[in-house]
């Protein structure tokens, strides 16, 4: 097994409900270690750029609005197979489809307000980490 780094985000719908600690605990209990973390309030421009891959999708405007509606916690996680493990702990995008005990099953309000975002591949993780963090901010 390989030690990897991945990007994780606690979305505004979760920070508004003071779930930062509970969600981080679920990630840490799964063996992931937070090696960088900061609280940001994403501008509309940042949200558009970060989620540019979804620009042509019907939900893009709603996503940008949600992501710029309040504070977000951006994190770098490290651990064995961190990318897959983070996605497993997050659960399916639609909380109705998520397995019991996952972040989205426990905390999500809807498919849009689903509490968390996580990288889906090593390449995406690298890009998303670099979007929010400089190398000196990541302390492994």
UniProtKB/Swiss-Prot annotation:
It comes from the Bacteria. One of its GO terms (molecular function) is metal ion binding. Its cofactor is Mg(2+). It catalyses: a 2'-deoxyribonucleoside 5'-diphosphate + ATP = a 2'-deoxyribonucleoside 5'-triphosphate + ADP; a ribonucleoside 5'-diphosphate + ATP = a ribonucleoside 5'-triphosphate + ADP. The keyword Repeat does not apply. One of its GO terms (biological process) is GTP biosynthetic process. Signal peptide: none annotated. The active site is at 117 (pros-phosphohistidine intermediate). InterPro entries: NDK-like_dom, NDK-like_dom_sf, Nucleoside_diP_kinase. Keywords: ATP-binding, Cytoplasm, Kinase, Magnesium, Metal-binding, Nucleotide metabolism, Nucleotide-binding, Phosphoprotein, Transferase. GO terms for cellular component: cytoplasm. CDD domains: NDPk_I. SMART domains: NDK. Coiled coil: none annotated. It is found in: Cytoplasm. Its EC number is 2.7.4.6. Its main location: cytoplasm. ATP binds at residues 11, 59, 87, 93, 104, 114. Belongs to the NDK family. Major role in the synthesis of nucleoside triphosphates other than ATP. The ATP gamma phosphate is transferred to the NDP beta phosphate via a ping-pong mechanism, using a phosphorylated active-site intermediate. Homotetramer. This is Nucleoside diphosphate kinase. It comes from Bartonella henselae (strain ATCC 49882 / DSM 28221 / CCUG 30454 / Houston 1) (Rochalimaea henselae). The gene is ndk.
């Amino acid at each position: 097994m390989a030690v990897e780094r991945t990007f994780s985000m606690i979305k505004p719908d979760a920070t508004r409900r003071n779930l930062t600690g509970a969600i981080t605990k679920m990630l840490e209990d799964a063996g992931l270690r937070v090696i960088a973390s900061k609280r940001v309030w994403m501008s509309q421009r940042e949200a558009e750029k970060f989620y540019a891959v979804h620009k042509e999708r019907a939900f893009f405007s709603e996503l940008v609005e949600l992501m710029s509606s309040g504070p977000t916690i951006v994190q770098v996680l490290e651990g064995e197979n961190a990318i897959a493990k983070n996605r497993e702990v997050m659960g399916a995008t639609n909380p109705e489809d998520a397995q019991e005990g996952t972040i989205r099953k426990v905390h999500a309000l809807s498919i849009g307000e689903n509490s968390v975002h996580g990288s889906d591949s090593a390449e995406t993780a690298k890009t998303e980490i670099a979007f929010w963090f400089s190398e000196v901010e990541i302390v492994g």
